[in-house]
A protein has these predicted regions:
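Noncatalytic scaffold domains of N-terminal-nucleophile
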Residues: 2-43, 48-153
Length: 153
């Protein structure tokens, strides 16, 4: 295992392990998320989309300020032998929301704060959609690492 230091090695710095290979690359904020993606690719024989989903689930657990199930996000995906695809995981307006409802309440635009500007979180559903379209493993396999970290620490 190699060591990856944040600054020059002076024997007092903390380190996180770095993993390297010849058939792919994984980069996440947390080494636990990276290791999850690595394991999904190498032990579980998943594809890059499976690995990304597993890493996102772990990242939401260990770094909820960076990625959360109640949030949003956009993914640019590149399936093999296909053009890139954008998967929009931004929040959705509630079904019954429309501008007329705002106008009748005296608003001329969507407010910056409060329940009227809140959207339905779509991060989690975008992970599922990515797996439906491009994944090869079942959700139980992909989520087992996040479950283990949540249960065992």
């Amino acid at each position: 295992m190699n060591r990856s230091y944040r600054i020059e090695d002076n024997n007092s710095n903390s380190f996180i392990p770095s993993y390297s290979g010849t058939n792919g690359a994984v980069a996440t904020h947390s080494n636990l998320s990276s290791m999850t993606a690595y394991n999904i690719l190498n032990q579980d024989r998943g594809n890059a989309f499976d690995a990304a989903a597993g890493a996102m689930l772990v990242e939401g657990l260990v770094n909820p300020q960076m990625f959360g199930m109640g949030g949003e996000g956009v993914m640019i995906l590149k399936p093999k032998n296909q053009n890139p695809v954008v998967l929009n995981g931004n929040t959705l307006s509630p079904r019954k929301f429309n501008f007329l409802n705002l106008v009748t309440r005296g608003f001329t635009e969507v407010p910056d704060e409060g329940v009227l500007c809140a959207g339905v979180p779509a991060a989690f559903s975008s992970i599922f959609r990515m797996l439906q379209l491009y994944g090869t493993l079942d959700f139980r396999t992909i989520s087992k690492y996040a479950k283990e970290y949540a249960k065992e620490g």
